[in-house]
Design a protein with these regions (language model features):
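C-terminal functional extensions of proteins
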Residues: 205-264
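A mid-sequence, solvent-exposed acidic-amphipathic segment
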Residues: 158-196
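Short beta->alpha connector loops
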Residues: 30, 203-205
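Long, contiguous secondary-structure blocks with strong helical propensity
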Residues: 137-147, 196, 243, 256-263
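A generic structural motif
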Residues: 51-54, 166-173, 223-229
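Short catalytic-loop micro-motif centered on adjacent basic/acidic residues
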Residues: 197-201
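A short, acidic, amphipathic alpha-helical segment used as a generic capping/interface helix at domain edges
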Residues: 7, 72-77, 179-189, 205-207
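Electropositive, gly/pro-rich neighborhoods at or near active sites that engage anionic ligands
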Residues: 1-161
């Protein structure tokens, strides 16, 4: 059975040893898209399939997926999910997240045509591993060339490492900024970039950037970090929806800060 801490150690070791790899995440949003369910995050509500509820989402978190309009993006996401390649790691949801449950974990395994060595935890860098991400992994970025796919509202000037190239995206970026994946791939090819780390904080667009980029060139590392750096980027949405972040940065006592995900 896969182990949450050991899986983190594996990626950390690869970064320390400058062994290039890709880590792409299929969290709950990607799960719903794969399942062909409507997905909307708006200012004060969300829709997932037939379920509508209230929550607060700031502009950088807004997204929309309507099955009747956006099948080409779902098809691309399926392609990224089904793809297998050496050192191409795909994080999926587990039943440890109550709103996901074992039924959806089993669904993802089945949709993937079975478990695989390259499947891992979508939450690998967050929850109980988040403190290690901040304190052990982020310092390793200082000595690496960093490319960053990040929201246009983010202020990257306070990050503890330098960014050599930034690719800015807006709201609903999977659809509105679909072409960024090609731009990242072309930039790497044209500049001869090698042994850089490409950080992605671009919702489901991250899956496209990482898949296209690593499939084309395995000489760089592609890392989907989601909202992990948002407290350092001057963004506010994490304070309302990310317990692992409020637990670490605001001492909120959120149980997500202690959650060790289990492979089931």
């Amino acid at each position: 059975m896969k182990d949450f801490n050991a899986a983190f150690d594996s990626l950390l070791s690869k970064i320390k040893n400058k062994e290039n790899f890709a880590f792409t995440r299929f969290s709950d949003g990607e799960l719903f898209i794969l399942q062909n369910k409507t997905l909307v995050l708006a200012d004060n509500y969300y829709i997932t399939g037939d379920i509508k509820g209230r929550n607060r989402y700031t502009k950088e978190e807004h997204k929309e997926f309507y099955p009747e309009q956006h099948q080409q993006y779902r098809n691309k996401l399926i392609e990224t999910f089904k793809h297998n390649q050496n050192n191409y790691f795909k994080g999926i949801c587990t039943s440890t997240d109550g709103h996901v449950g074992k039924q959806n974990f089993d669904w993802m395994i089945d949709f993937h045509d079975g478990d695989h060595n390259n499947l891992t935890f979508a939450n690998l860098l967050i929850n109980a591993n988040y403190s290690r991400f901040v304190e052990e992994m982020v310092p390793l970025f200082i000595d690496r060339e960093i490319l960053y796919v990040v929201n246009e509202l983010a202020d990257t000037s306070k990050l503890p490492f330098e960014i050599s190239k930034k690719f800015e995206i807006g709201s609903n970026c999977m659809i509105e900024d679909y072409g960024i994946a090609e731009k990242v791939k072309d930039y790497i090819r044209e500049t001869g970039t090698k042994d850089a780390i490409v950080l992605c904080s671009a919702a489901s667009l991250s899956n496209f950037v990482i898949y296209d980029g690593f499939d084309d060139n395995q000489d760089n590392t592609f890392l989907d970090i989601g909202s992990c750096l948002n407290p350092l980027l001057g963004l506010e949405g994490w304070k309302y929806t990310r317990g692992y972040l409020t637990g670490y940065w605001l001492n909120s006592g959120s149980p997500f800060q202690r959650q060790v995900d289990v492979w089931s």
